[in-house]
């Protein structure tokens, strides 16, 4: 990957565009501290804004080589080389001993004659290094600092809270490292670093294509920030292994394949509205440049060394027009188009616009004139400014046919989207003089790419700006702050649910797994990743968690929750959840029968023994004698009737299965929810035969299904343990 110099206003890049240079790069020194601080001051960075990848090229040192104590300067041929005196070097061990006041291990004896004591090294014996046994103090275990402390058992409630507090939407990536956020086509991370440094590692790539991006970024980056100078097509997005969100900083998203990103589950973010005023100001500036030919006058004056006479000024002014009374046509009267029209009215321009999506009365409120056909719009405009969205209907809307309908000598201004103009047709119209001038801030072709034949290269009367209409120092900083905050939301929260500026949020949620897009309130342990145990988070997220396997923290009661943990759709359907719970309790009942009790296998050494005592409401209550977490499942008040109705139909004599009658036991909004989600959840539901279930539970023919107790504790909770439900 090419290396870029981090010195301000130095644009040198190694192997840039295939060119080679004999410059080399130096890292920012870490020690001594005074030298590091002087380096950071020279390049305008601080400890918070500096990144580890930053390098300084050798052109900022006298003679092209860095010497000891040198500070980089902008230009050594003009600026005097700065050099400081460094403090004496200290080894790591001596520095550590000095800070901790630890004496040297082998102090060197001073010679009586003052000579070097090197002669005494050969005469030293074993006793010189170790004190005599008589002077060695007796060993007292009570005072020994190495006495092992008694083991402290972890608080079971704290252990359970550690599991439940782990984020359910930690983005995919290596569990042993922090998330990686990459700035693809830039190198200044001074604004983003303070916002993201505590949750992610920020790296800059300064790449013009994905071929220049380091493999580590492609494999580990979960979020990306980008400007306009790099394009992400489908094949580019597929190179990123774990990318979840891309934020486009600036105006427009033409350089991102949003459709491909949606198919890959990548959220595309863009913050509109922060640059409306800036784009409108730049657009009006380009319009005035075309009318008054200011750009060509300035260019002629800067390129000519002799005095410019009246004849040359008159020659440069060919094609200029009076601003007042001219007609400005705005194609797309949205926020930017409206802002441009209001500014242009102050200069005496008559404003017309064509936008079939604007409500009636919008023109009267603004003082504009509305036209209802594209032909009338093109034929009446002296200058056309494009401010519409890019889509299938608007792509190439300025082409050879539409340009033929324009007045001769019309001006074209585009600060919106590059695909709105057919550049080949515009180049032909500029060369034959039908279009007197054009100002383009966005380009469909790469202007300086030698492998791309740009039709606009060499065209007369054209102003090209590098997608800078939105750029001001204040607006750029605001956009970067919003982008960093959005990336922080994606890392700490739910992606894309919590994103404010995601333009494909609904599509990503609709195309993704239905379980993943509804993790907000269904189940606290849903959608957590664990390398060996499904639906559990990595243990590195909770360093003080004492168990290598989270199941051990919950004891044997965790076995009763397995139906919920193994099937992510169960928390969304009370009927399916209760069916699986009944099946699990049936297995426990069969193991607890007198016939099988004598042949039960010995319990696992990790299983917590518990004493059983009857509960208050007909269910069995367990009181653990060893530290173990008590697992309780909350039952919402409005779901009680649904579960009881399902149990009644499950044990009914007609033998209907629970799956076929689940919808009839749910009322109101819950029934509609099941119907809308039926295609998603019915695949995961297990159809239970009622007769077979009654045989396994040893339940005879019941006239009143209410005799089966489901262990409702005060109408709010169900305590789940190893014992079968009371019948």
From Swiss-Prot:
Keywords: DNA-binding, Metal-binding, NAD, Repressor, Transcription, Transcription regulation, Zinc, Zinc-finger
UniProt feature, compositional bias: Low complexity: 587-613
Region (Disordered): 64-158, 587-629, 652-681
4Fe-4S keyword on record: no
GO CC terms: nucleus
Biased composition (Basic and acidic residues): 77-94
UniProt superkingdom: Eukaryota
Zinc fingers, THAP-type class: 5-60
Consequence the record notes for mutating residue 334 to V: Does not rescue the extended lifespan phenotype observed in ctbp-1 deletion mutants
Deletion consequences: Adult life span extension and increased resistance to oxidative and heat stress but not to DNA damage, starvation or pathogen stress.
Binding site for NAD(+): 251, 331-336, 355, 388-394, 415-417, 441, 467-470
GO biological process: negative regulation of transcription by RNA polymerase II; regulation of transcription by RNA polymerase II
UniProt GO MF annotations: DNA binding; DNA-binding transcription factor binding; NAD binding; oxidoreductase activity, acting on the CH-OH group of donors, NAD or NADP as acceptor; RNA polymerase II-specific DNA-binding transcription factor binding; transcription coactivator activity; transcription coregulator binding; transcription corepressor activity
Entry domain remark: The THAP-type zinc finger mediates DNA-binding but is not required for repression of gene expression.
Summary of subunit composition and partner proteins: Homodimer.
Functional summary from the UniProt entry: Binds DNA and represses gene expression. Plays a role in regulation of life span, possibly by regulating transcription of genes important for lipid metabolism.
Family designation: Belongs to the D-isomer specific 2-hydroxyacid dehydrogenase family.
Protein name: C-terminal-binding protein 1
Species classification: Eukaryota, Metazoa, Ecdysozoa, Nematoda, Chromadorea
């Amino acid at each position: 990957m090419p290396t870029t110099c981090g010195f301000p206003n130095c644009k040198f890049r190694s192997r840039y565009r295939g060119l080679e240079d004999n410059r080399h790069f130096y890292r920012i020194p870490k020690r001594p501290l005074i030298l590091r601080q002087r380096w950071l001051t020279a390049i305008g960075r601080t400890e918070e804004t500096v990144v580890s990848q930053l390098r300084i090229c050798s052109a900022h040192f006298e003679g092209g080589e860095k010497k000891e104590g040198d500070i980089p300067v902008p230009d050594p041929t003009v600026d005097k080389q700065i050099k400081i005196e460094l403090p004496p070097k200290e080894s790591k061990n001596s520095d550590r001993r000095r800070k901790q006041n630890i004496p040297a291990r082998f102090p060197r004896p001073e010679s009586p004659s003052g000579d070097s004591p090197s002669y005494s090294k050969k005469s030293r014996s074993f006793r010189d290094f170790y004190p005599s046994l008589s002077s060695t103090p007796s060993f007292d275990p009570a005072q020994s600092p190495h006495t092992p402390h008694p083991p402290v058992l972890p608080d079971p409630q704290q252990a359970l809270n550690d599991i439940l507090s782990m984020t359910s939407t930690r983005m995919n990536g290596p569990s042993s490292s922090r998330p990686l956020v990459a700035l693809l086509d830039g190198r200044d991370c001074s604004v983003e670093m303070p916002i993201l440094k505590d949750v992610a590692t920020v790296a800059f790539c300064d790449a013009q294509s994905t071929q220049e991006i380091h493999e580590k970024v492609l494999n580990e980056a979960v979020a990306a920030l980008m400007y306009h100078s790099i394009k992400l097509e489908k094949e580019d997005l597929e190179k990123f292994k774990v990318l979840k969100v891309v934020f486009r900083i600036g105006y427009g998203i033409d350089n991102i394949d949003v459709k491909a990103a949606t198919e890959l589950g990548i959220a595309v973010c863009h913050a509109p509205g922060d640059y409306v005023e800036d784009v409108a100001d730049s657009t009006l500036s380009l319009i005035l440049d075309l009318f008054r030919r200011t750009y060509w006058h300035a260019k002629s004056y800067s390129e000519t060394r002799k005095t410019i006479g009246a004849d040359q000024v008159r020659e440069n002014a060919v094609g200029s027009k009076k601003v007042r009374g001219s007609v400005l046509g705005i194609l797309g009267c949205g926020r930017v188009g409206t802002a441009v029209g209001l500014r242009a009215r102050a200069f005496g321009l008559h404003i017309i616009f064509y936008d079939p999506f604007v409500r009636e009365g919008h023109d009267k409120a603004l003082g504009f004139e509305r036209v209802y056909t594209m032909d009338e719009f093109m034929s009446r405009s002296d200058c056309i400014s494009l401010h519409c969205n890019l889509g299938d209907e608007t792509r190439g809307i300025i082409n050879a046919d539409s340009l033929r309908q324009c007045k001769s000598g019309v001006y074209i201004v585009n600060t919106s989207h590059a695909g709105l103009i057919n550049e080949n047709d515009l180049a032909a119209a500029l060369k034959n003089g039908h279009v007197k001038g054009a100002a383009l801030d966005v380009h469909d072709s790469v202007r300086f790419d030698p492998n791309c034949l740009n039709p606009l290269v060499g065209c007369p009367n054209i102003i090209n700006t590098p997608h800078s209409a939105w750029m001001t120092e204040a607006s750029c900083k605001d956009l970067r702050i919003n982008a960093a905050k959005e990336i922080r939301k994606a890392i700490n929260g739910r992606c894309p649910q919590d994103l404010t500026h995601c333009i494909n949020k609904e599509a990503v949620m609709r195309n993704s797994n239905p379980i993943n897009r509804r993790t907000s309130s269904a189940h606290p342990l849903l959608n957590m990743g664990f390398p060996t145990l499904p639906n559990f988070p990595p243990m590195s997220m909770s360093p003080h968690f004492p168990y290598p396997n989270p199941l051990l923290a919950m004891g044997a009661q965790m076995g009763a929750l397995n139906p919920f943990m193994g099937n992510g759709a169960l928390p969304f359907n009370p009927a399916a959840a209760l069916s699986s719970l009944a099946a699990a309790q049936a297995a426990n009942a069969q193991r607890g029968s007198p016939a099988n009790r004598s042949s039960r296998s010995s319990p696992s050494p990790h299983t917590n023994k518990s004493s059983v005592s009857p509960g208050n409401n007909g269910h069995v209550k367990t009181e653990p004698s060893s530290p173990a977490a008590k697992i309780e499942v909350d039952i919402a008040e409005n779901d009680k009737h649904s579960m009881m109705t399902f149990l009644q139909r499950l044990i009914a004599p007609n033998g209907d299965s629970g799956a076929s009658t689940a919808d009839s036991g749910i009322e109101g909004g819950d029934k509609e929810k099941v119907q809308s989600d039926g295609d998603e959840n019915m695949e995961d539901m297990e159809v239970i035969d009622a007769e077979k279930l009654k045989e396994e539970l040893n339940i005879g023919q019941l006239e009143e299904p209410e005799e089966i107790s489901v262990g409702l504790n005060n109408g709010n909770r169900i305590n789940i343990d190893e014992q079968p439900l009371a019948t």
